[in-house]
Amino acid sequence: MHKINTWEGRLVNKNMKYLVIGDVHADYLPFKRAVNFATENDLHLICVGDLIDNGEDGAICVSEMLKLLETGKATMIKGNHEHKIIRHLNGANVLLGPPNMVTLNQMETDKLFEHEFRQMVEEYCQEYVKLNDTLYFTHGGMHQDFWEAEKTGNITRRMYDDMMFGQADYKKTFHHKGQDYPYRTYDWKDSVPGHVKLFVGHDPAPLTGEPNFDSFQPEPTVYVNEQGGTTVWLDCGAGKGGKLFGVVVNSSTNEIEDTIDFTQND
């Protein structure tokens, strides 16, 4: 069952400003700087997913995010890493890699971590969120047919999968740290409507296709398609040796007012 993907009931002022951050991957110091910046500047924090895995700080990142969620000061998108870990915890047979094992090994001895993670995912994580029909936030991407399907409420399982995983060519793979990953495809970016800004994470080297997770964009990528629809890729490799970036978004103007690097040679 999917949660209602709107801001209503989330204690959010629709005319306020937001700090939207990329994938954290359990890298606490830059995440804490982002939280502090949002708090000091009265910004609602939006994480576009993948708060956990890879890094060693998953427990404290989840605990801090949960406090923000419970007080209505943050919104959490479900990333593919949250999706995989919660499925494993619930008994599903999923393929686990080294990044996942960092989290699961910690949960074996830290049951509070597991409890708070479950609470975060089951009570608060959403596949996508929209604001004023012009600002959309998800993890991996939006299926080309999503924009029409949303109008009628006929959002399919495939569309929800694309929100978490993006799209890929499974006939072509890249070997990375013991696992094969499909090449990523980006045709969906050209279907974003002209009035929409779409913010995503997931991909630290967008528009290249090759899933080389040791290669990171130096700052968020902004792509504008022919009809004026905008996609912003925020993942810059935090928790993997890269950086954590955030953008300040004004919901009254739909503009990005600032781009901030929260990594300081950690």
What are these regions (language model features)?
Residues H25-L29, D53-E56, E82-I86, Q144-D145, ...:
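Active-site environment of divalent metal-dependent phosphoester hydrolases
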Residues N5-N13, V20-I21, L69, V94-L95, ...:
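Catalytic phosphate/metal-binding cores of nucleic-acid and nucleotide-processing enzymes, i.e., regions
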Residues D23, D50, G79-N80, T103, ...:
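Divalent metal-coordination and catalytic microenvironments
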Residues M1-E64, A74:
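N-terminal active-site segment of His-dependent metallophosphoesterases
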Residues K17-H25, L135-G141, V232-L234:
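Active-site-proximal beta-strand elements of phosphoester/diester hydrolases
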Residues E219-D266:
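Binuclear metal-dependent phosphoesterase catalytic core
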Residues N54-F137, H143-Q144, A149-D169:
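Active-site neighborhood of divalent metal-dependent phosphoester bond hydrolases
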Residues V20, L45-C47, M76-I77, Y136, ...:
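Residue-level marker for buried hydrophobic side chains located in beta-strands
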